[in-house]
UniProtKB/Swiss-Prot annotation:
Name of the protein this chain belongs to: 3-isopropylmalate dehydratase large subunit
CDD domains: IPMI
Catalytic activity: (2R,3S)-3-isopropylmalate = (2S)-2-isopropylmalate
NCBIfam families (alphabetical): hacA_fam (TIGR01343), IPMI_arch (TIGR02086), LEU2 (TIGR02083), PRK00402.1 (NF001614)
Any Pfam family hit: Aconitase
EC number: 4.2.1.33
GO molecular function, one term: 3-isopropylmalate dehydratase activity
Binding site for [4Fe-4S] cluster: 306, 366, 369
Amino acid sequence: MPMTITEKIFAEHIGREVKPGEIIMCDVDMTIGNDITTPISIRAFNESGAEKLAKPDNFAIVLDHFIPPKDIASANQAKINRDFAYKHDLKNFFDEKDMGIEHRLLPEKGLVIPGDVIIGADSHTCTHGALGAFSTGMGSTDIAFCMITGKSWFKIPESIKVVFKGERGEHVYGKDLILELIRRIGVDGALYKALEFTGEVIENLPMDDRMSLCNMAIEAGAKNGIVAYDKITEAFLEEVKKYNPLRSEPKIHYSDPDANYSQVIEIDVNKLEPLVAYPFLPSNGKPISQAVKDDIEIDQVYIGSCTNGTLSDLRIAAEILKGKRVHRRVRLIVTPATQRIYKQAEHEGILDILIDAGAVVANPTCGACLGGYMGILGDGERAVATTNRNFRGRMGSRSSEVYLSNSAVAAASAIAGKIADPRDL
């Protein structure tokens, strides 16, 4: 029976063919928790009477949302995680000593492998599909069950094939591809579907951008986003192996040519501009030319998050900001996604460029993205952010506004004091 890549991953795990709509129980290759969600899982784990993790080397806790802790409550959450990690001698425990946002850190650590089934107690766990894995977010109780058994249940999703055709223009990145898709299909246009990203644009899309693309699959309601293994995946893993061993060998799957899709969406990117998603939904995408005409003044620019806090994002921002100054009315906050990215940006002189331009460079953290700290918006304030959500109150006050963009638009806007087109600089 012809199958998609997502279906093949599940079929390989349970030893037989699967079809959409079927409910299965499946071994999980990597289970992920963070400082916010894991304490609930730990409580359920302890209440179950379990004494040890089913797969300790396949379980990771990443302290990333409020690290270093912002207050007593977040410090206590971190302590619950630390105590559990030390008690169980958890190998894959990451805190201030080796910090990063989970969805960018774990691929760096060689813990995300093509062909994996991955679950995490965070909705943006779908990021890891960029490496050809099935990866999805679940609730803390589901995570606890997997901690105890090493398994989880899944309903096999139908797949939507998204074909990006043509060639990307100047300052058009993975972020713009996913914003365009969400603009077309809406925030529930892929509800419980697997979004399979294909086409000549994807074949030439760098891994950082593929991760941005898969990261926001959930913003269309998708169960997962996925890109098939290819030379770019291989090159990424070879780079990872220079500083971390891979957890296991890749298991490579490709969709059959006659696989069944619930929908095929073709997007010609030849004329696609950088996009800006207006408040209060990621689906409110508008071309940068329209945003410039709307003359939208801003108070803050935030470059970071699991979507766009990568080294390539910092390089893009530095290229635009070099020799320039942030507008006197604007705050620019830059948050590298991992400590390795931070160190490499420092090595390349990127941090000096950003600081000289007037930016604040924060430690790796989710921080302001979820309205946590390190860049919260006040009443009536307006921000351009390279994050993934712009719901009302997402980054602070309920009367604030967040406009989502790529890093080039964000950097240009920081200079102009209003939403600006980086192609005009």
